[in-house]
Curated annotation (Swiss-Prot):
Region described as Interaction with DNA: spans on this chain: 20-22, 54-57
Protein name: Probable archaeal histone 3
InterPro entries noted in UniProt: Archaeal_histone_HMF, CBFA_NFYB_domain, Histone-fold, HmfB-like
Molecular function in Gene Ontology: DNA binding; protein heterodimerization activity
GO CC terms, sorted: chromosome; cytoplasm
Quaternary organization: Homodimer or heterodimer with another histone. Dimers then assemble into higher oligomers, with the DNA wrapped around the protein core.
Positions of the record's site feature: Interaction with DNA: K14
Entry annotated with the keyword Mitochondrion: no
Xref: NCBIfam families: archaea_histone (NF043032)
Keywords from the named record: Chromosome, Cytoplasm, DNA-binding
Amino acid sequence: MAELPVAPCVRILKKAGAQRVSEAAGKYFAEALEEIALEIARKSVDLAKHAKRKTVKVEDVKAALRG
């Protein structure tokens, strides 16, 4: 089960143009976003560790998003 709240995910889907969003779609979207966010977070943490830092900085997140 996703830790991300479903309501903001539903708002994102509506912002993208959906008129209505089922509860199941909102939950599945939240789970998918969480998986994507965790992968970015893992890469960011790895980059911070590689730089011998405990703190994840914005440049780590930007680099993780780049690839």
